[in-house]
Amino acid sequence: MAAITAAMVGELRAKTDAPMMECKKALTEADGDMARAEEILRVKLGSKAGKAASRVTAEGIVATAINGSTGALLEVNCETDFVSKNDDFLAFVNDCVKLVAEKNPADVAALLALPLNGQTVDEVRSALIGKIGENIMPRRFKRFTGSNKLVSYLHGTRIGVMVEFEGDDTAAKDVAMHIAAMKPVALSMADVPAESIAIERSVAVQKAAESGKPPEIVEKMVEGSIQKYLKEVSLLNQTFVKNDKQTVEQMLKAANTTIKGFTMYVVGEGIEKRQDDFAAEVAAQVAAASKATA
C-alpha cells in the first residue's frame, strides 16, 4: 500500500476541488495513483463539482448573526442571482455564518474545515456545487466580540452592515441603515485612508489647474475639494439619511449613542464578473461537435 502524503492530497484537491477527505479516500483506494484517484472522484462526485468550482462567483448573499455580544458578517458567492435565492444555498450560508460566530475560524480555509452536519463545511459545499451546478464559495467574513453592543442591517441580501456601539438600540439601527444607503468608507474624517485622500487630491489638483487661476487660488480650491470629499465619505460627518437637517454625529449626540466601529459588505465588490460572448460560445460548441464527429 502506497503512503498517502499531504502533498498528494493537496495536489488532487487542486485538480478536482473535491473535499480533502474525499481526496484522501480516493488516493487510498487508488493506491496512490493520481490519475486513478481522479477517475474515482469523477465517478463518486460527478463532473459538476470540478467544472463548476473553476468558474467566477460574483453573485451571492451577505448574512449576519448576533448572539449576545458576539456577531458575524459573512459573504458567500455563487455564479448567478437565481442560485442566490435557492433554499439549499440560503441554508448553507446560514449555517456558515453561525459557525463563524460560534467557532471563530481564523480564515476561509479554517471555516471550510469545520464540522457541519456530520461532514466538513467544504464537503457540504462540494456536494451543493454538484447538486446546483454552480460554484459556491465563502469569500470573506468578520467576527465581532467584546464589550460593545452589536446591531446588524441587511438591505435585501446584497448589502450587510454590522455596527458596534454604546447607547440606544434604535439610533444604532438607524445608523446601520444609513451606512447601507450612503456607504461611508470611514467612521470619521481622521479615519479616511491616506491612499484614498491622495487619489482624491491628485484629481482635485488636475481639475483646479485646468481653471487657469493663480496658484494660491488653486491651492484653496484643492483644499476645499478635499474637505468636501472627507465630509462625504466619513460616517459622522454625513447628512443623516432620515433627517437632512442634521449630521449623523448630531443625531447620535441627541440619542446619547456612540458608534465604535462598523463594517459593510456588498456582494461581489471587487470581483470582475464574467462577460459571456454568446456567439463565441456557440462557435466553440459547433467546433467541438465537428471534431467529435470527424
UniProtKB/Swiss-Prot annotation:
Name assigned to this protein: Elongation factor Ts
SUPFAM superfamilies noted in UniProt: Elongation factor Ts (EF-Ts), dimerisation domain, UBA-like
Lineage: Bacteria, Pseudomonadati, Pseudomonadota, Betaproteobacteria, Burkholderiales
Coiled-coil ranges from the UniProt annotation: none
GO CC annotation: cytoplasm
Family statement drawn from the similarity comment of this UniProt entry: Belongs to the EF-Ts family.
Cellular compartment(s): Cytoplasm
Region named Involved in Mg(2+) ion dislocation from EF-Tu: 80-83
Molecular function (Gene Ontology), one example: translation elongation factor activity
Taxonomic source organism: Polynucleobacter asymbioticus (strain DSM 18221 / CIP 109841 / QLW-P1DMWA-1) (Polynucleobacter necessarius subsp. asymbioticus)
Keyword field contains Protein biosynthesis: yes
InterPro entries named in the record: EF-Ts_dimer_sf (IPR036402), Transl_elong_EFTs/EF1B (IPR001816), Transl_elong_EFTs/EF1B_dimer (IPR014039), Transl_elong_Ts_CS (IPR018101), UBA-like_sf (IPR009060)
One Pfam family it belongs to: EF_TS
Role according to the record: Associates with the EF-Tu.GDP complex and induces the exchange of GDP to GTP. It remains bound to the aminoacyl-tRNA.EF-Tu.GTP complex up to the GTP hydrolysis stage on the ribosome.
